[in-house]
Amino acid sequence: MFDDDSEVERKGKPRHLLGIADEESIRHAVTRGIDTLDSCYPTRVARHGTVLTKDGPLKMRSGKYSKAFGVKIDESCTCPTCQQYDRAYLWHLFKAHEPLAVTLAAQHNIHYMNEMMRGIREDIMENKI
């Protein structure tokens, strides 16, 4: 999908990829010359009870988080969700079908993706990509 540029003549124009999803796909696309992208991935997975972390996605509806009091969603995250709430509370919100669960998970996921993209931009500026 990203490897064949033979039919695409760039002429200095940016290349946009619509609907790219997960972190691995984004990194792959960037290394193949994609300049811009958009995605509903962070909010879509939040609606299904998943939060994104540096250690991989967490399915917050899992009972293993029911007693995770005092444990941040992602220990290194600086988003408002991680600063104010723990995994047990987010688990409770999802189990109780509270709309706030999706709001908090989406807020976290968007922050996570923004930080990931910041890192990719820094890698590009430092010629690591």
Q: Whereabouts are the PLM-identified features?
A:
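C-terminal extensions of enzymes
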Residues: 74-129
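Glycine-rich phosphate/ribose-binding loops and adjacent secondary-structure elements
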Residues: 1-73
